[in-house]
Design a protein with these regions (language model features):
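Conserved hydrolase catalytic core segment
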Residues: 104-146
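Conserved HGGG/HGGXW glycine-rich cap/lid loop of the alpha/beta-hydrolase fold
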Residues: 26-77
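Catalytic histidine-centered segment of alpha/beta-hydrolase-like enzymes
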Residues: 273-285
C-alpha cells in the first residue's frame, strides 16, 4: 500500500497527567477527522490495515486518530482491574482525547469501541458530526436490563467470554511464536497473519523471556464483565445520521437490539453482512470503507 508509513505513533497526556499512546495520520487541510476506538483486548495498531486502506480511499481528505484505550496497547494510564466496574472510564478518556483534536470529528469504533464512540457522540453532538458503528456490543433494552440485574447480584462472574480472556496465555518467546500460536485459532480464525502481527506489535511489550501482552488477561476479562448495558439512554439522544455495519456469525449486535435500534428513527441506517463474523473489519475492510464513504457522501 502506497501510504503504509504515513501513520505515526504519538503520546497524549490527559488532565490527570496520564500518558496515552495513539496512532495519527494528520493530513493538512483534511476534510474529515476520523477518530477510531478499538475493541476489548485489542489496540489501535490492530487496525493498521484498515487505516491504510482508509488513507488510500480518502487520500489527504482524511486525518485519522486511533487511541490505545486505558489498559490496552501502549498506553500507560492507570488500569487496576479490581476497580473496573463500568465502561464510564473509557467514555471519559475518549471525550477528553477528542477535545484535544481541532475541529469536528467522525466518531467510529469496533465492538466495545463503537459503544464508546456512540456515547461520546450522544454527549457531545457539537463536536461529533458523524457516527459510524462497526459490530457494536449492543443488546436489546430487556436483555440489557437482565444483564445489569445479573451484574448487581454478581451472577455474571461466570461470563464465558470473560473467563476465556482471563485464561489467555500472556507470555511468548517471540512475536513470531505468538503469531503462529494465534493463527487460525479462536477469535483469530478468520484473520490473516498481517492482522494478527499488527495486533501483537501494538499490544505487546518486551520482557526478559520474550514478549508479554500489554493488555493483561485480568484487565481484558474485567472489561468484558463491566460491559456497558445502559447504552439505550444515550442512543435515544442521538439526532445525527448514523451508520451501523454488522455481521452475522458470533455478532454482538443482538436481534432484539437491531429491532429496537432501527425503530429509533430514519437517521439510523445500516448494512448487514450475512457472511461476516463479529470481526467484520478484519474480514471485509474494503466493503466497510465503501460503506463509510457512501455514508459521508450522503
Amino acid at each position: 500500500l502506497k501510504f503504509i508509513h504515513s501513520i505515526e505513533r504519538k503520546t497524549y497526556t490527559n488532565t490527570a497527567g496520564e500518558d496515552f499512546s495513539y496512532l495519527a495520520h494528520e493530513s493538512h487541510g483534511s476534510k474529515f477527522n476520523f477518530v477510531f476506538f478499538h475493541a476489548t483486548g485489542f489496540n489501535a495498531e490492530t487496525y493498521q490495515i484498515f487505516f491504510d486502506k482508509l488513507i488510500n480511499c480518502f487520500g489527504n481528505q482524511v486525518s485519522i486518530y486511533a487511541l490505545d484505550q486505558r489498559g490496552h496497547g501502549l498506553s500507560n494510564a492507570k488500569s487496576d482491574h479490581t476497580q473496573l466496574k463500568s465502561w464510564d472510564i473509557f467514555i471519559d478518556d475518549g471525550k477528553e482525547f477528542i477535545d484535544s483534536i481541532e475541529g469536528s470529528v467522525i466518531c467510529s469504533g469496533h465492538s466495545m469501541g463503537s459503544i464508546v464512540a456512540a456515547k461520546i457522540s450522544s454527549l457531545n453532538p457539537k463536536k461529533v458530526s458523524h457516527l459510524f458503528m462497526i459490530e457494536p456490543v449492543l443488546y436489546g433494552p430487556l436483555e440489557s436490563l437482565k444483564f445489569r440485574f445479573m451484574s448487581m447480584i454478581k451472577y455474571n462472574r461466570g461470563l464465558s467470554i470473560a473467563d476465556g480472556a482471563a485464561k489467555r496465555r500472556k507470555e511468548f518467546p517471540s512475536l513470531e511464536d505468538a503469531v503462529t500460536s494465534y493463527t487460525g485459532r479462536g477469535a483469530f480464525t478468520t484473520w490473516t497473519k498481517d492482522w494478527i502481527s499488527n495486533y501483537l506489535k501494538g499490544g505487546t511489550r518486551s520482557i526478559e523471556s520474550g514478549i508479554e501482552l500489554s493488555c493483561s488477561p485480568e484487565w481484558e476479562a474485567a472489561t468484558f464483565r463491566s460491559s456497558s448495558m445502559d447504552t439505550w439512554r444515550y442512543l435515544k439522544q442521538i439526532k445525527m445520521k448514523v451508520k451501523v455495519v454488522y455481521g452475522s456469525i458470533g455478532s454482538t449486535f443482538s436481534l432484539q437490539a437491531r429491532n429496537s435500534l432501527f425503530k429509533l428513527g430514519s437517521h439510523w441506517d445500516s448494512n448487514y453482512y450475512k457472511d461476516a463474523s463479529h470481526f467484520l473489519p478484519m474480514e471485509y475492510p474494503d466493503s466497510v470503507i465503501k460503506d463509510l464513504e457512501s455514508y459521508l457522501n450522503n
